[in-house]
From Swiss-Prot:
It is an enzyme of class 5 (isomerase). Pathway: Carbohydrate degradation; pentose phosphate pathway; D-ribose 5-phosphate from D-ribulose 5-phosphate (non-oxidative stage): step 1/1. Transmembrane segments: none annotated. This is Ribose-5-phosphate isomerase A. The active site is at residue 103. Substrate binds at residues 28-31, 81-84, 94-97, 121. Pfam families: Rib_5-P_isom_A. The gene is rpiA.
């Protein structure tokens, strides 16, 4: 079974958490794209969705699902998103698709965060296999880069990428994130940082892992 098939298994299993007549929070990325396709099969059951990226908005509309603005929603029943890495405490690194700030905003609206991944995304320590994305206001790029170096990281400017918010991304290598909560707070306090890709303060509540044996649920 290939990686795409495992992503589809996890995405399909997430439909079990979708309640009738609710607005669903939707993240971004390849696994979420599988979820949006699956959501299209039950679109008449839900009111619509709030999306964390313009790309996800477009896919939702193609499926005939109404897209709501986050400002018009006081809370969401669930938020479904993928991850670049996830640890046993259900904390994540996200932001490979450069939508991390909006993902945090939509996740914060949700009562329950459902993370859907394939088994390759599971790690013991965050930062093991994937650099940490940091979204930065453009005028602060060099300044933030120096701060990240001082913290022991090796930031790399993600060429040609502008986020939906008009910001840039620094991918930070060499971070072994042993205390995700504290590092998330520390990096978010750096002047010029919009947010960083550690999702520890608001981690996942349920993890659905697509494996060759089927969807495995960790709650």
């Amino acid at each position: 079974m290939d990686q795409l098939e495992m992503k589809k298994l996890a995405a399909q299993a997430a439909l079990e958490y979708v309640k009738a007549d609710t607005i669903v929070g939707v993240g971004s990325g390849s696994t979420v794209n599988c979820f949006i396709e699956a959501l299209g099969t039950i679109k008449n059951k839900i009111q619509g969705a709030v999306a964390a990226s313009k790309a996800s908005e477009e896919l939702l509309r193609k499926q005939g699902i109404e897209v709501f603005n986050a400002n018009d929603v006081s809370s969401l029943d669930i938020y479904v998103d993928g991850a670049d890495e996830i640890n046993p405490q259900k904390m994540m690194i996200k932001g490979g698709g450069a939508a991390l700030t909006r993902e945090k905003i939509v996740a914060a609206l949700a009562k329950k965060f459902i993370c859907i991944v394939d088994s390759s995304k599971q790690v013991d320590v965050l930062g093991s296999t994937f650099p940490l994305p940091v979204e930065v206001i453009p005028m602060a790029r060099s300044q933030v880069g120096r701060k990240l170096v001082a913290l022991g990281g090796a930031p790399e400017y993600r060429e040609g990428v502008v986020t939906d918010n008009g910001n840039v991304i620094l991918d930070v290598h060499n971070f072994s994130i042993l205390n995700p909560v504290e590092m998330e707070k520390e990096l978010n306090n750096v002047a010029g940082v919009a947010t960083n890709g550690i999702f520890a303060l608001r981690g996942a509540d349920v993890v659905i892992v697509g494996t060759p044996e089927g969807a495995k649920i960790i709650d």
